């Protein structure tokens, strides 16, 4: 009985820490592909897309192989929207990449992220409860989370981003 109660308490705490639409986005600092510290706070006043990615994920591969992700990244860049690709895979685990591999993947895929951020400890992934890839978050100029979920939840990714980012 004690284990059941403790389990329920733990689950309620886990649920309480997840980010909800309308919440302030948790602030973080991560190293990018060039080993420079990037802070979410430095983009206050700009719209930001967070893309949790794993180059070995079949869903990520599909979006990059078809050019869908690159087209969205380019479109967002043209609108001065910051795109942060985040890799939360631990060293020795599937999906882990080094700084050099991040640069190589970006070039090979002709991708347009503003930065590739390496979160090998998974701390930022846990802050946002990002568990799948590609898991997307849209943050407005005030630092509020306006969307979270799959890139293709609405079927038309362009509409998804133009709708959510125009708020």
Can you say where each PLM-predicted feature lies in the sequence?
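Sec-dependent N-terminal signal peptides
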Residues: 4-13
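Structural microenvironment flanking redox-active thiols in thiol-disulfide oxidoreductases
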Residues: 61-109, 120-125
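Thiol-/selenol-based redox modules, centered on thioredoxin-like
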Residues: 140-167
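Cleaved targeting-peptide boundary
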Residues: 17-25
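Loop/turn elements at helix/coil->beta-strand transitions in domains of secreted/extracellular proteins
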Residues: 45-48, 78-83, 111-114, 141
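A short beta-strand-turn-helix
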Residues: 28-48
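Short active-site neighborhood of thiol/selenol oxidoreductases, capturing the structured segment around
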Residues: 41-61
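Short, internal strand/loop/helix patches
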Residues: 103-140, 145-146
């Amino acid at each position: 009985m004690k284990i059941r109660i403790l389990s329920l308490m733990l689950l309620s705490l886990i649920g309480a820490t997840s980010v909800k639409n309308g919440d302030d986005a948790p602030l973080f600092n991560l190293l990018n592909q060039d080993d420079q510290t990037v802070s979410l706070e430095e983009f206050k006043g700009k719209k930001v897309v967070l893309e949790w990615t794993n180059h070995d994920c079949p869903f990520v591969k599909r979006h990059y192989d078809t050019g869908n992700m690159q087209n969205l990244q380019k479109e967002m860049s043209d609108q001065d929207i910051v795109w942060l690709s985040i890799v939360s895979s631990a060293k020795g685990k599937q999906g882990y990449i080094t700084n050099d591999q991040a640069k190589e993947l970006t070039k090979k895929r002709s991708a347009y992220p503003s930065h590739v951020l390496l979160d090998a400890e998974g701390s930022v992934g846990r802050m946002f409860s990002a568990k799948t890839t590609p898991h997307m978050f849209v943050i407005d100029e005030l630092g509020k989370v306006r969307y979270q979920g799959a890139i293709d939840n609405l079927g038309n990714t362009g509409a998804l981003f133009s709708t959510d980012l125009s708020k």
